[in-house]
């Protein structure tokens, strides 16, 4: 679900990049020294999981692990995912350098949302297997939702692409 450079309007790219930069700055300010190794491992997991592709009809899907990263890292997900996205953009050509802030928001914001959902008392009362499924599903769902919304509001010609992406991913 990487957005390449030049796909979005400059205004959308700038606004979402600023939001991502603020979130990243907050994550840097609150991370504890003992959380750094776990953040590094989560970043490596995110990077490596992107290599595992599963054929699905006319397309393919790959693991993103947003729910897992989110429940372990919370707001520090912005740090782990940014490092992995930079490596993916520079080494593999996934996404782009200019759109990295948008891709960070699409990936890290759902991880933080899942973290907060997982902390609720109601969510903790759900059967463990269902809860684990929901952690994975909700991470992918929110990432898809953010991607679709960003495409939809960026350019009118992306409206049908946004609907297609939502249909394939959900």
Region locations from a protein language model:
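Short helix-perturbing small/polar motifs within transmembrane alpha-helices
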Residues: 103-148
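Membrane-interface helix termini and inter-helical loops of multi-pass transporters
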Residues: 1-4, 153-165
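Hydrophobic alpha-helical transmembrane segments
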Residues: 11, 36-41, 78-82, 100-105, ...
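Hydrophobic transmembrane alpha-helices
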Residues: 2-68
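Membrane-water interface at transmembrane helix exits
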Residues: 25-29, 49, 54, 88, ...
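Alpha-helical transmembrane-segment detector that highlights a single hydrophobic TM helix
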Residues: 61-80, 84
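Interfacial aromatic-anchored transmembrane helix boundaries in multi-pass membrane proteins
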Residues: 51-60, 83-114
């Amino acid at each position: 679900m990487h957005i390449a450079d030049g796909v979005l309007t400059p205004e959308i790219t700038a606004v979402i990049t600023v939001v991502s930069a603020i979130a990243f700055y907050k994550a840097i300010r609150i991370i504890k020294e003992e959380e750094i190794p776990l953040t590094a491992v989560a970043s490596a997991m995110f990077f490596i999981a992107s290599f595992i592709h599963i054929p699905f009809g006319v397309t393919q899907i790959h693991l993103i692990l947003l729910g897992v990263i989110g429940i372990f890292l919370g707001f520090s997900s912005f740090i782990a995912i940014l490092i992995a996205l930079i490596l993916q953009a520079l080494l593999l050509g996934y996404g782009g350098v200019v759109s990295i802030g948008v891709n960070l928001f699409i990936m890290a914001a759902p991880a933080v949302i899942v973290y907060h959902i997982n902390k609720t008392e109601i969510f903790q009362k759900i059967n463990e297997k269902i809860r684990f499924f929901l952690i994975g599903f909700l991470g992918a769902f929110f990432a898809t939702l953010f991607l679709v919304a960003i495409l939809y509001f960026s350019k009118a010609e992306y409206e049908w692409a946004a609907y297609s992406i939502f249909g394939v991913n959900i």
